[in-house]
A protein has these predicted regions:
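Active-site helical microenvironments for divalent-metal-assisted chemistry
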Residues: 1-158
Length: 158
């Protein structure tokens, strides 16, 4: 898996500064929380469609339909230009995809906040809170949602 991620990110047509450490952290959180391998693999691959040349068909072939479906659900629609609209559409997409996609989304936000050294943008914090609130409203609280809630308490609304 690490070789696939490194190859994908080394040959990507993607944003600068995105390395394999973040996807690995996103995969480790659900693994450590006892989630099934499909969720762990989707965590490892959650950004690969946005950030690399990897296609949904390639994901389906290499990792199966369940992983491909989850990764697609976690991929934002870059055709939506406005940040708020794009993130709202992503939140709906994740909620509609089911609790496994929600777990990976929580892990993604948690891993980002775990590695941050300074206050994230207000709109990013607002997106994380809206994601957390939507997931808890639909699927209830979990260890990952509680962890993200604690992380977000470091940055009160401004």
């Amino acid at each position: 898996m690490r070789v696939f991620l490194e190859d994908a990110y080394l040959t990507r047509l993607a944003r600068a500064g995105k390395m394999v450490e973040h996807p690995i952290a996103v995969g480790e959180l659900p693994r450590d929380d006892g989630h099934p391998p499909t969720v762990v693999v989707a965590g490892l691959l959650h950004d690969v469609l946005e950030d690399t040349d990897v296609t949904p068909a390639e994901l389906h072939t290499r990792f199966g339909p369940d992983v491909a479906r989850l990764v697609q659900a976690l991929t934002q629609d870059t055709a939506i230009v406005k940040y708020g609209e794009r993130k709202a559409a992503l939140r709906r997409q994740i909620l509609d995809a089911g609790p496994e996609a929600a777990i990976v989304s929580l892990a993604d936000k948690g891993a980002k906040l775990q590695s941050v050294e300074h206050r994230p943008e207000n709109r990013r914090i607002a997106h994380y809170r809206a994601t957390l609130d939507g997931i808890e409203a639909r699927y209830g609280r979990s260890r990952l949602s509680e962890r993200l809630r604690e992380q977000l308490e470091r940055w009160p609304e401004r």
